[in-house]
Amino acid sequence: MNTDIANQLRVAKKATTDLNLIQSDTRTIILKTLAANLEKHIENIIQENQKDLSLMLEQDPRYDRLLLNKERILSLANDVRKVASLPNPLGVNLLEKSMPNGLSIKKITVPLGVIAVIYESRPNVTIDIFSLCFKSGNVCILKGGKEAHFTNSYLLLLIKNTLKNFNINTDIVCLLPPERALITPLLNATGLVDLCIPRGSQNLINFVRDNAKIPVIETGAGIVHTYFDKSGDLEKGKKIINNAKTRRVSVCNALDTLIIHADRLKDLPELVETLSQKNVIIYADQDAYQVLDKNYPEQLLMKAKPQDFGHEFLDYKLAIKTVPNIKAAIDHIQQFSSYHSEAVIAEDESAIDKFLTEVDAAAVYANASTAFTDGGEFGLGAEIGISTQKVHARGPMGLEALTSYKWVIRGTGQIRD
């Protein structure tokens, strides 16, 4: 392992002891102070962010994710306050029982330990990760991408200065250099890092999963579908589809494929009409193309190719698939889903129940936009990522997902026969 990285991780591991001694009320006060400092230094944050943005083309899909403006920084500070106000997730009694032999057994929540998060062009993640890890008693190792290095470095400075004002060991948070070559040593840090969470492209997630010797929770990649059923309400559908696709195209809960029942193809032009106002390019299968031809801007309408399905666009692009029934819709989703977020628009309760029961995803929706798959929208304050796996955590990962548990047994001298 790289010697410098190993030393940083050892220092971080040692800092878990100091972090565990901080009282819950103190953590809350520190997080509220951090939120105030974010607001106080908005102009400085934007200045550092502009340095990063100047090195990226505005047409790059990552540009929007990298951008921090006043509105987003204020929202970020508000998210920190929400995390601060959440109940303490540690020391929660999950189970308690008295055994016939007199033993008292409790199962209580504890921190995971040292959490490493590898992420790319979203500097807001730096603050989200720290606030959640700090509140849940975990040391955090931050491995941001080079495209956000100036912004991440300044945000880390704000965090460390806030901690210093309370005489807190600043080793509880660490920002590793942005070089990709350092990812492998981090993934090999058995005994020093308790969990790694990759947030970013599918290539990054695949690399981490395939090369890690430490535990990993997969997050991020979202190939998102919305199925407009035979019984779907047209007005609801128009609003939901537009919101899921165009609210923020660069996020993992954005709509990628619209699936439509063949009996409702006549309504397709109206369903997607507002998308043309945002210059959304549609990749339509044969049936959908025939309906949209002359009913959607010619320059924005393309014939779908096989690779357009099962693709996370992260852009103003949408694939459309026509199906004869709900079973075919579910089959298509199960073939191409990344198990992130899937939605149905329907008025038929039996269709809704079938979809919600049979579709395998971290979040399944009926008559609502997939844009809601978010820690803040789920009342978690913020999220460290959206898990697309089933072990330990699934969906938006808030404070509870950053804890484990231990068994506490009290006796009066009992021995086992």
Swiss-Prot record:
Catalytic EC class: oxidoreductase
EC number: 1.2.1.41
Gene3D superfamilies in the cross-refs: Aldehyde Dehydrogenase, Chain A, domain 1 (3.40.605.10), Aldehyde Dehydrogenase, Chain A, domain 2 (3.40.309.10)
Major localization listed first in the record, in broad terms: cytoplasm
Recorded metabolic or biological pathway in which this protein acts: Amino-acid biosynthesis; L-proline biosynthesis; L-glutamate 5-semialdehyde from L-glutamate: step 2/2
Keyword Amino-acid biosynthesis appears in the UniProt entry: yes
Subcellular localization, as worded in the UniProt entry: Cytoplasm
GO molecular function, one term: glutamate-5-semialdehyde dehydrogenase activity
GO cellular component terms, semicolon-separated: cytoplasm
Catalytic activity: L-glutamate 5-semialdehyde + phosphate + NADP(+) = L-glutamyl 5-phosphate + NADPH + H(+)
Domain of life: Bacteria
Role description: Catalyzes the NADPH-dependent reduction of L-glutamate 5-phosphate into L-glutamate 5-semialdehyde and phosphate. The product spontaneously undergoes cyclization to form 1-pyrroline-5-carboxylate.
Protein family (similarity comment): Belongs to the gamma-glutamyl phosphate reductase family.
Annotated NCBIfam families: PRK00197.1, proA
Stated name of the protein: Gamma-glutamyl phosphate reductase
Naturally occurring in which organism (per UniProt): Legionella pneumophila (strain Paris)
Designated gene of the protein: proA
